[in-house]
Amino acid sequence: MGERPGRGGVSELNPLAVVRQARMAGIVWDEGFARVSDLAGRFGVSAVTVRADLTALEARARVRRVRGGAVPPSGLLGEQPFESSQWEAPLQKSSIGVHAAGMIATGDTVILDVGTTTTAIARALVLRTGLRDVTVVTNGLNIALELERASPRISVVVTGGTLRPLQHSLVNPLGTTLLERLRASVAFVGCNGVDPEVGITNVNLPEAEVKRAMLLAARRRVIVADGSKVGEVELAKVCDIEEVSLLITDPTADPEVVAEIAAAGCQVELAG
């Protein structure tokens, strides 16, 4: 655990840098993730200066550098920012993405949840150049931008709602309004926990509510989760395991838990 960012341990030789770094650390802690480019704009300094400041802050355990910016030190957040979690199990997530994208057919309407594994689905879907007339409904702003490259083969509908910067997601208020009026071919929903008894769970309540609405809006309900999520239980329940049509995970998942999930009535497929 680190301490709340402040001036302690910073050289007093450059008062402007002292104040700027303290404020940068505060932004990282308050927002969960801060981009180098955004910090440069806020403080009116170059990206080189921001990177130097973040490196100095990391050396004092005030922040942790990640690609493109910084997050709070490890262990301080129950929920990791998108930019941090995308580097966890990347090969497994990529395999799941290709597997899931292979299920989509021309003419399908697809609901695609926010998250790093669902982002892998979006990237794999872009590469399926033979698909036509596919509509993707998403609450992930980054996913919408990933799919923009495939327009007009793939039409993108953004759900609307209230922005959660930590995951670039849209939630309630107004996050489920559109979903309540849809009937999609399939929904691909991510999560932080898949347990045969508790069901599908997520680390935060606002997104769990949207995830449930996504599943209810689809004829086929698919959970995508790398092996580290299988057997885990988090704060917010999304649904029971028997409400899920299919779980796509990877071979690193605990085989005993996978067998229990299958026995509970949920089909399981291992990608990769």
Predicted regions and their residues:
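HTH-adjacent hinge/linker in prokaryotic transcriptional regulators
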Residues: 2-114, 120-132, 149-153
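Conserved SAM/SAH-binding loop
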Residues: 118, 140
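Rossmann-fold dehydrogenase core element
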Residues: 134-135, 156
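Conserved helix-loop-beta element of the AMP-binding
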Residues: 132-134, 247
